[in-house]
Design a protein with these regions (language model features):
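Short pre-active-site segment immediately N-terminal to redox-active cysteine/selenocysteine motifs
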Residues: 31-32, 39-42, 85
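Hydrophobic beta-strand anchors of alpha/beta hydrolase catalytic cores
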Residues: 35-36, 66, 89
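Typically the conserved alpha-helix immediately C-terminal to a functionally engaged Cys/Sec
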Residues: 45-60
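Structural microenvironment flanking redox-active thiols in thiol-disulfide oxidoreductases
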Residues: 69-78
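Non-catalytic, surface beta->alpha helical segment in thiol-disulfide oxidoreductase systems
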Residues: 85, 90-126
């Protein structure tokens, strides 16, 4: 992946790279919805989505947090959330997953989904099930 992307735990405006060590602090305890990009460095679709994801993180500052998980380095997180393909975007609210997008998608599609999710996240949460830790 590109060397200009943030390293673990660093913040690039609204985009944080997370691991098992900081998962709870970044994702589980967030008051805002969090979208997590599960990616792998060997995947060209992950690399393509990275630029879109970073761009979208700027648009949603203060309304949604953005996080990245390298699945090669964090197999436990990928397994915990059933990530079978990269890239996968998994949306969380109050620490609970409630929506996912598998594969690369055009920016306008992701932006539209994110707007919809922000409008509906509390209702979506009431319909989601908590996954075991």
């Amino acid at each position: 992946m590109s060397s200009e992307l943030p390293t673990e735990g660093t913040d690039l405006v609204n985009l944080v790279t997370v691991s098992s060590a900081n998962w709870d602090a970044v994702v589980k305890t967030s008051e805002l919805p969090v979208v997590v990009n599960f990616w792998a460095p060997w995947c060209p679709h992950s690399e393509k989505l990275a630029a879109t994801f970073q761009s979208l993180s700027h648009r949603f500052i203060g309304r949604m947090k953005f996080a990245r998980v390298n699945t090669d380095e964090n197999k436990d997180l990928a397994a915990r959330y059933g990530i079978m393909s990269v890239p996968t975007l998994l949306y969380f609210y109050q620490g609970r997953p409630y929506f996912q997008v598998i594969g690369d998608a055009p920016k306008h599609q992701l932006e539209s989904e994110m707007d919809h999710i922000l409008a509906q996240h509390k209702r979506c949460l009431s319909r989601s099930s908590e996954r075991p830790e």
